[in-house]
């Protein structure tokens, strides 16, 4: 556990060569410091020389910034990592992924979620938004590692007897009442799979339950052109307009992918205050397309990044998504100014927190949770580095391998590049065994 590694008692002061608060302005504090109080929240951020007396520094050098936030993941798919390569989305799901996932037990999900959570923490990802089944096991898996979790249990009509999802929605409502506890690192939402799996009316009913609970409504939206065409053929309108018609956009909404959204769709999402989770690697690997991120941002839609599942990515390194989001925004428009490095970094920090309706993560500021990471800058990829280019270097050279330390709510869960909470070798061995059993079943 963390304490066994000699983690210092709170309060603590972390001092770094640079602090990047990620407030949206690209501000960098040279010789910065972050104070963490006894409750695991940030009490002060600024130049170390200006903060006044405080605890002796426990970390010095490098760069401190907020922990990254993965806004769309199916992390327990670590057990089916890389299956079905080369198949389009529909066949990939039906032929390769779902048959294996349907054999996964809650114990499988618990181990697989813990494995993915470790992978993310080592990459500096402190929060993930999970759309998955066996939600109790997902919570238990993350509890072992010390990460922050937004769990949005899935609703899939194809798994419900006769397509009746009402009992499942009742389960999720009860789960929300029992487990939604942001102060204990767990937030709960509702996740209808998609409007091509569920009817518009069902999506509206699920959204109403989410809105009544003040919870996030998390749905796959316009991931492929085939999906868009199918929904129009079946229901007479694109998915976003159907969701608006049934009131599904009237509360907190997170739409995953958004690759084929048109101008009307984007304006509806913007008016509703909805967010889009952009998953560029998964969309490219599955041949789904490239989301119009520049148009989304231009129309006022909040955009963040996610990895999607490790079966379609195939890792959980969010730095890759940040970099690819910026590259695709520029390359697809032939405009090197289409997305600045500051905006790209925001997609995994401040904007990601907004997407998940988490008010106290994603920035380093007084009162926020002390979810933060340290990067080693004493490496070739960051040499030379200058104040005026540092954000650009974070976006285009940043990677999991440069993350040395990670704190969640003030607890140091990664220390000197090692997980401080679980036995990683045992975890990997058990997941290897369980993955082999799934394939052989």
What does each model-identified segment do?
Residues 223-272, 284-297, 309-320:
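Catalytic core of soluble alpha/beta enzymes
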Residues 81-147, 170-182, 432-436, 440:
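Alpha-helical scaffold segments that flank or form the walls of functional sites
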Residues 245-252, 294-379:
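His/Asp/Glu-enriched, well-ordered alpha-helical/loop segment
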Residues 137-259:
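Metal-coordinating catalytic core of metallo-dependent amide/deamination hydrolases
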Residues 79-111, 118, 145-166, 224-252, ...:
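Active-site gating loops and adjacent loop-to-helix segments of metal-dependent hydrolytic enzymes
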Residues 17, 34, 40, 61, ...:
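Divalent metal-coordination and catalytic microenvironments
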Residues 1-32, 36-41, 346-441:
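Active-site microenvironment of metallo-dependent hydrolases
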């Amino acid at each position: 556990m963390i304490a066994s590694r000699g983690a210092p008692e709170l309060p603590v002061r972390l001092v770094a060569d640079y602090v990047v608060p990620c407030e949206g302005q690209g501000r960098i504090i040279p010789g910065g410091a972050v104070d963490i109080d006894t409750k695991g929240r940030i009490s002060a951020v600024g130049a170390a020389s200006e903060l006044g007396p405080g605890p002796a520094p426990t970390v010095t050098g490098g760069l401190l910034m907020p922990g990254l936030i993965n806004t769309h993941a199916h992390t327990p798919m670590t057990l089916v990592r890389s299956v079905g390569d080369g198949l389009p989305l529909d066949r990939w799901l039906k032929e390769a992924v779902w048959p294996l996932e349907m054999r996964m037990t809650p114990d499988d999900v618990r181990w697989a979620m813990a494995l993915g959570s470790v992978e993310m923490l080592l990459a500096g990802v402190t929060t993930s938004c999970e759309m998955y089944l066996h939600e109790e096991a997902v919570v238990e898996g993350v509890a072992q590692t010390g990460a922050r979790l937004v769990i949005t249990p899935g609703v899939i009509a194809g798994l419900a007897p006769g397509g009746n999802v009402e009992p499942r929605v009742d389960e999720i409502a009860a789960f929300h009442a029992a487990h939604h506890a942001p102060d204990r690192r767990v937030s709960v939402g509702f996740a209808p799979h998609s409007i091509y799996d569920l009817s518009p009316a069902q999506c509206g009913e699920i959204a109403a339950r989410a809105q009544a609970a003040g919870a996030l409504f998390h749905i796959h939206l316009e991931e492929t052109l085939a999906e868009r065409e199918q929904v129009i053929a079946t229901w007479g309108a694109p998915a976003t307009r159907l969701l608006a018609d049934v009131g599904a956009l009237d509360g907190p909404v997170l739409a995953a992918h958004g690759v084929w959204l048109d101008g009307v769709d984007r304006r509806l999402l913007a008016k509703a205050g909805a967010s889009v989770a952009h998953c560029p690697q998964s969309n490219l690997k599955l041949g789904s397309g490239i989301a119009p991120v520049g148009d989304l941002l231009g129309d006022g839609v909040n955009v963040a990044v996610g990895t999607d599942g490790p079966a379609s990515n195939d890792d959980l390194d969010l730095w890759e998504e940040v970099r690819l989001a910026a590259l695709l925004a520029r390359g697809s428009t032939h405009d090197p100014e289409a997305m600045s490095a500051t905006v790209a970094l925001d997609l995994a920090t401040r904007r990601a927190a907004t997407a998940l309706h988490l008010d106290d993560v994603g920035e380093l500021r007084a009162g926020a949770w002390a979810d933060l990471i340290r990067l080693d800058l004493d490496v070739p990829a960051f040499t030379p580095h200058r104040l005026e280019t540092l954000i650009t270097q974070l976006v285009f050279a940043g990677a999991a391998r440069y993350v040395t330390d990670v704190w969640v709510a003030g607890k140091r869960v990664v220390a000197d590049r090692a997980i401080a909470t679980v036995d990683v070798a045992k975890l990997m061995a058990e997941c290897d065994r369980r993955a082999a059993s799934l394939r052989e079943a």
